[in-house]
A protein has these predicted regions:
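Bacterial N-terminal signal peptides
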Residues: 35-45
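Bacterial N-terminal signal peptides that target proteins for export
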Residues: 21-35
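Short, intrinsically disordered, low-complexity terminal segments
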Residues: 32-34, 47, 648
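Intrinsic disorder/low-complexity segments
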Residues: 10-12
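Terminal presequence/propeptide segments associated with secretion/organelle targeting
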Residues: 49-667
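Extreme N-termini of proteins with methionine-enriched Sec-type signal peptides or N-terminal signal-anchor
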Residues: 6, 20-23, 654
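Short, Lys/Arg-enriched N-terminal segments with co-localized hydrophobic residues
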Residues: 2, 14-22
Length: 667
């Protein structure tokens, strides 16, 4: 028979503070809540008699008691508990669990033990035994297991100074594969996106709501509903369970781990329970995340522990999104827990909600955005990037991919910690397709020496727009070897076709390329991520000759042959641009110019790199041969025209236009 903990349902609610309400006001409101929580805690501590505990060694089969929990609003109610026996060594910390049977009108109403009841204190003869924490769905929800209070109180004395990130589910079969999430305030599109992202953490979101009294802090007592929250502010995301024991400003709850992170910085919130939702597997409480009242600083096998009146460390996020079509603007302010594993997901799901709410639609669009990550350590450099994306399917999802990847790479890098203080995002979105195809490009000179400047002109065609040109220069590296040098001209988000062919040839997936990529240190990682090409740039860079598609004699170096192809719909924008070699082996030499469009297409030039003396000699010879070719062509044209019959005016015009076109293509 499989045991399931009474996992605490996640709740998400959207608190409205008024249009344009700044973050400092929210912060002040949180501080007021915390101050009120301290006063409420102190006011109820004085008259309370010391609670007696019942050790497991004194527990006997057949003992009868009761448990406390909330199934509606904030009213604490009770249900009956009968001891069935002791299960040795079955606890998450290696301790014992007490097997119990629950009953009574409340249990009949909820159809058994429900998720969210985790932490419900169990009393026998007035003594606190522990917290209802696990259940057997196969028993109709009437059989559960209690975590002893002695194991839970140890949470107050543990401090290893470590945040362990996310711990995999216990091998003892006590933690289910999924945890229900409750959400309110999210657009339907944002809910779908949230569901996909939370699958990585074995959690499934459901719709919830907010309560009118959520802003009013309430004192905690055994049996109260409490939330361990990961996101607070305009949006709230948290796990709701039950308080087991309170001593002054300290409390323990849940009776099982939330995410088993060890030392934590969750926000502690009150919770209002709307109802208990029936389920085929196990029912769960549906509630809101209320006023912020403290910090949850421990998350371990025996439960969670925290302090009221203490503000946790957090990462703030401000997202400003403007829909250029409707001029609607969405401003979002949230605070998030500083967990390396969760922060990428918490960040992008919040930003996705902001862009989805601003657009009020789903589908194609172009987004232009800038974001900055500010580190907690002011001595470390902030990370700032701008980029542009187009999607024909879901521009909201497309626009947050880069932010997710960058936050993940920086937060989970192998060199050093990079804790963030805040994230700022500014987005402008439109339904207009702002893309351009790179038609061709010309370059001069085609014979160069190390250190020379090459002038490149790219011709681009916007989607349903007029052709335009972009000029840029490229400096030949001073250490460039003599011989052929191949330059790639491409859109900033396009992976050169030769590299894609090599990737397929050796069956190199994006995951493998990411593994073989190396960085010298954190500064190298930080710098190179910031300098990654932008999708709205025309980029010129040296292409590895080992993977070039240009064969000798196929290209005269005067014009790039452009491949008319788009980048993959969901490319990893951090692909290795240096071919199959490790990134750290050589510096990438490139030049780029910004445009107002997402650029597609790429092609290559071949240049001859020679010593200066040989270069000058070759250029003179080339100029002379071009001059001779021009003279010969002029004489031939003159002779042809003299021998021709007189043509009509229209025919003459067509021939002249044809000559002009040929001359232009030959340039």
């Amino acid at each position: 028979m499989r045991m399931y903990p009474m996992k605490s349902p996640f709740l998400i609610s959207n608190l409205y503070f008024g249009k344009g309400d700044p973050m400092p006001n929210r912060f002040k409101k949180s501080m007021k809540h915390l101050a009120a929580a301290v006063c409420l805690t102190l006011s109820c501590v004085m008259p309370c008699a010391a609670q007696e505990f019942l050790p497991v060694s004194e527990v006997q089969e057949g003992m009868h008691g009761y448990a406390k929990t909330v199934v509606h609003g904030t009213k604490i109610e009770t249900f009956d508990v009968d001891v069935l026996g002791i299960m040795k060594g079955k606890g998450a910390t290696g301790g014992d669990l007490v097997l119990v049977k629950v009953s009574g009108p409340l249990i009949d109403q909820t159809e058994g033990i429900a998720q969210g009841m985790s932490g419900s204190p169990v009393y026998i003869d007035g003594k606190l035994l522990g917290a209802v924490a696990y259940g057997f769905p196969q028993s109709g929800g009437r059989i559960g297991m209690v975590t002893p209070i002695g194991d839970m109180l140890k949470l107050w004395t543990i401090d290893d100074g470590k945040d362990t990130g996310l711990t995999p589910p216990s091998s003892k079969g006590l933690i289910p594969l999924t945890t229900p999430l409750m959400a309110s305030g999210y657009t339907p599109e944002a809910m779908d996106f949230l569901a996909g992202k939370m699958q990585d953490f074995h959690m499934v979101p459901f719709a919830s709501a907010s309560a009118s009294q959520d802003d009013v802090p309430q004192p905690l007592e055994p049996g109260s509903a409490v939330s361990a929250t990961m996101v607070t502010g305009d949006l709230k995301l948290g796990a709701v369970g039950t308080v087991t024991y309170v001593d002054g400003d300290r409390m323990v709850a849940f009776g099982h781990p939330f995410m088993d992170r060890g030392n934590t910085d969750y926000f502690m919130h009150n919770s209002y329970i709307f109802t208990v939702i029936p389920s085929k597997n196990i029912p769960f409480k549906l509630g809101s995340v209320g006023a912020e009242i403290g910090t949850v600083n421990q998350d371990r096998g025996a439960g969670i522990g925290g302090m009221m009146g203490k503000l946790p460390h957090a990462v703030s996020l401000h997202a400003s999104v403007t829909d250029e079509d409707t001029k609607k603007k969405e401003d979002l302010h949230v605070r998030m827990i500083p967990n390396e594993a969760l922060l990428p997901t918490l960040s992008v799901t919040s930003v996705y909600h902001a862009i989805s709410n601003a657009m009020d639609r789903k589908g194609q669009g172009t987004v232009d955005f800038t974001y900055t990550l500010y580190p907690e350590d002011m001595k470390q450099k902030p990370f700032t990037r701008s980029n542009m994306y187009w999607s024909s399917k879901d521009i909201a999802e497309r626009s947050v991919d880069e932010l997710y990847n960058v936050v993940r790479l920086l937060e989970q890098n192998r060199f050093e910690k990079y804790p963030l203080r805040s994230i700022m995002v500014d987005m402008h979105v439109t339904s207009e397709r702002k893309t351009a195809q790179l038609l061709d490009a010309s370059a001069s000179p085609i014979i160069v020496s190390p250190g020379d400047t090459i002038y490149v002109r790219a011709r681009l065609s916007p989607y349903r727009g007029e052709v335009f040109y972009k000029d840029l220069t490229f400096t030949v590296p001073k250490d460039q070897p003599y011989g052929d040098m191949i330059l790639e001209v491409r859109g900033g988000g396009v992976v050169p076709l030769p590299y894609l062919i090599q990737q397929q040839k050796f069956n190199l997936t994006d995951e493998i390329l990411d593994r073989i990529r190396t960085y010298k240190d954190f500064n190298d990682l930080h710098s190179r991520l910031m300098k990654e090409d932008q999708n709205n740039q025309v980029v010129v860079e040296i292409l590895d000759p080992e993977v070039s598609m240009i064969s000798k004699g196929e290209n005269d170096g005067k014009k790039a042959e452009i491949q008319e192809k788009k980048a993959p719909e969901n490319p990893d924008y951090l692909k290795n641009k240096d071919g199959l070699k490790e990134d750290g082996e050589k510096e990438t030499h490139k030049s780029a110019v910004d445009t107002d469009y997402v650029i597609y297409g790429d092609g290559q030039f071949t240049f001859k790199v020679l010593p200066q003396a040989e270069r000058d000699k070759a250029l003179k010879k080339l100029a002379k041969s071009k001059q001779q070719a021009t003279i010969e062509m002029s004489n031939k044209e003159k002779e042809t025209l003299e021998n021709k019959d007189k043509k009509t005016e229209g025919t003459d015009k067509d021939e002249k236009d044809s000559q002009k076109t040929s001359a232009m293509i030959a340039l």
